[in-house]
Amino acid sequence: MAAVAVAVREDSGSGMKAELSARPGAGGKEMTQEEKLQLRKEKKQQKKKRKEEKGTDVDTASAVSAAQCPGPAREAPGPGSQSSTPGEKVPAGRTKAELRAERRAKQEAERALKQARKGEQGGPPPQASPSTAGEAPAGGKRLTEHTQADDPTLLRRLVRKSERQQVPTRKDYGSKVSLFSHLPQYSRQNSLTQYMSIPSSVIHPAMVRLGLQYSQGLISGSNARCIALLRALQQVIQDYTTPPNEELSRDLVNKLKPYICFLTQCRPLSASMYNAIKFLNKEITGVSSTKREEEAKAELQAAADRYVQEKIVLAAQAILRFASKKISNGDVILVYGCSSLVSRILQEAWSEGRKFRVVVVDSRPRLEGRHMLRFLVRAGVPASYLLIPAASYVLPEVSKVLLGAHALLANGSVMSRVGTAQLALVARAHNVPVLVCCETYKFCERVQTDAFVSNELDDPDDLQCERGDHVALANWQSHPSLRLLNLVYDVTPPELVDLVITELGMIPCSSVPVVLRVKSSDQ
């Protein structure tokens, strides 16, 4: 058995002691486990000593090789750095986190050196920009839901599309506030049908009549607009005839596109109208090619009737039952504007014998609250009327706020008549619960956190105030520095809404994505 001679030598360069083990002879027995570990440790120490003797030359060579290597840079341990071998201990006074940060900084410096050398050889180095998961690729197109009225390229594209479909385009009216310059400005003075020849137009007369009613404000409210749209589409389907060598499921969808474009030019479509059009298009594309035309048209008209009955009429009845449970005797209920659903809820609760009082809050220029006040007075409900600047003075005596909704967005925000967010904010300051009544067919997958990106600009001339023979702001367009803003909707964050009452039940705003997911799976 060969003896293991242990020699201790002192290194003159570092003052460190290393234990060197002699290998066993060829004729000796096999080394034990302790001897193998000792030999392995000896090799590591020798390797470290050789690198320390090289000193600065080793560090420079490693930096150059790391800059030329395409893979991740590896660091050569020097006197002040820690080796990555597991058998080595962390130097005293320095933590592992500090050493990792030091190595990371050195790697970044080596990458910068590499980029600088590339720039010297072939132009400027590419600028590194932090990429996030939510950003779109640089070469990708950003699809906008609404046409940007201040983008000439998109406007030219819209004009060409309207010309192909033989649909007149609306011209902008007056000067707009710069913050909302991307939204189209609507005016009742610019008529779309002024130069339209009805007999030679591709637009169905029922759709022309509907578009004019939208633009003049004769039909307003999400439910009323959606029902009127489906009735007009039923008339279009009734008068439709499938051309030769065409299928109804394909040709009818193409026929409806210019009609929808015309309605959008008259007034932007609501979320409820988008969902109704999506439903009808799906029903049309599902028509079998072997089915007779009259039978297919009858089925499509029945589908439109079923949509109105289930999504609007029956949904309103279910909401009435849920909302009536939230109205108690002695309540003081604040409502805003005129929501047909809220009006029915209050009248139904009063007819059931509950005694309460209603405060109707209104705002210019539409003054829709007057219609709500008229409905309540006819039903015998005690009501008071005030404008929105005075709402904070009556909220201390209000027990709950009952509001309607134009749409419920996927992030839980409520899109409703402008001023709703202000009322919800003041109600939260007075600890008054805010209840929103909304059918689920108004839920949409759009996400919006403010009222600036997507909204509707109504006629600015509606802001003119008549006082006897004097009309305030009569010649506002003659002043180039004056701009009028008649915003239609605002967005209320979900934090200000306590409960949403739907036909499915009473849910929080955070449950809107769940309802959308269930609806998409059912379809």
From Swiss-Prot:
Q: What is its main location?
A: cytoplasm
Q: Note the InterPro entries from the entry.
A: IF-2B-related, IF_2B-like_C, NagB/RpiA_transferase-like
- Its name, as the record gives it, is Translation initiation factor eIF2B subunit delta
Phosphoserine modified-residue sites: 12, 129
Do you know which SUPFAM superfamilies this protein is assigned to?
NagB/RpiA/CoA transferase-like (SSF100950)
Q: Where is the composition biased (Basic residues)?
A: 41-51
User: Quick one: signal sequence residues?
Assistant: none
User: Which species is listed as the source?
Assistant: Oryctolagus cuniculus
Locate the Phosphothreonine modifications and list their residues: 85
Q: Which PANTHER family does its entry note?
A: TRANSLATION INITIATION FACTOR EIF-2B (PTHR10233), TRANSLATION INITIATION FACTOR EIF-2B SUBUNIT DELTA (PTHR10233:SF14)
- Which residues carry the post-translational modification N-acetylalanine, per the record? 2
Domain of life, source organism: Eukaryota
Q: What quaternary arrangement does the UniProt entry report?
A: Component of the translation initiation factor 2B (eIF2B) complex which is a heterodecamer of two sets of five different subunits: alpha, beta, gamma, delta and epsilon. Subunits alpha, beta and delta comprise a regulatory subcomplex and subunits epsilon and gamma comprise a catalytic subcomplex. Within the complex, the hexameric regulatory complex resides at the center, with the two heterodimeric catalytic subcomplexes bound on opposite sides.
GO biological process terms, alphabetically, are: cytoplasmic translational initiation; myelination; oligodendrocyte development; ovarian follicle development; T cell receptor signaling pathway; translational initiation
- Family recorded in the similarity comment: Belongs to the eIF-2B alpha/beta/delta subunits family.
Please summarize the record's notes on activators and inhibitors of this protein. Answer: Activated by the chemical integrated stress response (ISR) inhibitor ISRIB which stimulates guanine nucleotide exchange factor activity for both phosphorylated and unphosphorylated eIF2.
Where in this protein does the record put region Disordered?
1-154
Q: Name one GO cellular component term.
A: cytosol
Biased-composition ranges, Basic and acidic residues, are 31-40, 95-120
Q: What does this protein do?
A: Acts as a component of the translation initiation factor 2B (eIF2B) complex, which catalyzes the exchange of GDP for GTP on eukaryotic initiation factor 2 (eIF2) gamma subunit. Its guanine nucleotide exchange factor activity is repressed when bound to eIF2 complex phosphorylated on the alpha subunit, thereby limiting the amount of methionyl-initiator methionine tRNA available to the ribosome and consequently global translation is repressed.
Q: Keywords for this entry?
A: Acetylation, Cytoplasm, Initiation factor, Phosphoprotein, Protein biosynthesis
Locations listed in the record: Cytoplasm, Cytosol
**Where are the stretches annotated May bind the chemical integrated stress response (ISR) inhibitor ISRIB?**
170-179
Which Gene Ontology molecular-function terms are recorded? Answer: guanyl-nucleotide exchange factor activity; translation initiation factor activity
